Amino acid sequence: MLERIKDSFTESIQTKIDAAEALPDSIAKAAEMMVACLLGGNKILACGNGGSAGDAQHFSAELLNRYEVERPPLPAIALTTDSSTLTAIANDYSYDEVFSKQILALGQPGDILLAISTSGNSSNVIKAMEAALSRDMTIVALTGKDGGAMAGLLGASDVEIRVPSNVTARIQEVHLLVIHCLCDNIDRTLFPQDENA
């Protein structure tokens, strides 16, 4: 039992080391896109399933409230939180459309979709991406493994942040770190702090 616990920490550390080599450029590009989106008066919509739904809500909460610095709230919506909407769409249409229908209603050109899936193959997230593209939104995709079908939907103006792992738990751990990196970059770009203060 103790060895298994230690192995989980070791795997997590190694995955983060690998991600630190592979992901900074795509994280920086995604943060720049998000800053431009927010400066343009647009918003960021986020979606995912299970733990990825929690990540979508975490990201939205950090923007709407604050990350590490005092600042005005920033517009972000987690598409995972309204149980009446989610169950109505799932019941009347299908679970595959629970995010896409919200995007068709709320998404505007210039908005960003933060699409989160450890496998890259979640069908409702893929439909969300298709809806976002139809609304002239750009996409930041957080994936893992081989990127799945989500990777094939991305265009030149989109960005994929693919965690170099095949283990769902390790991918989720890095997704949270990526979200914190995005929030930190957004805050420090929009609201520069005096590092010596």
From Swiss-Prot:
One of its GO terms (molecular function) is carbohydrate derivative binding. Keywords: Carbohydrate metabolism, Cytoplasm, Isomerase, Metal-binding, Zinc. Substrate binds at N49, G50, G51, E62, N91, D92, S117, T118, S119, S122, Q172. Its EC number is 5.3.1.28. SUPFAM superfamilies: SIS domain. It is an enzyme of class 5 (isomerase). One of its GO terms (biological process) is carbohydrate metabolic process. InterPro entries: GmhA/DiaA, Phosphoheptose_Isoase, SIS_dom, SIS_dom_sf, SIS_GmhA/DiaA_subfam. This is Phosphoheptose isomerase.
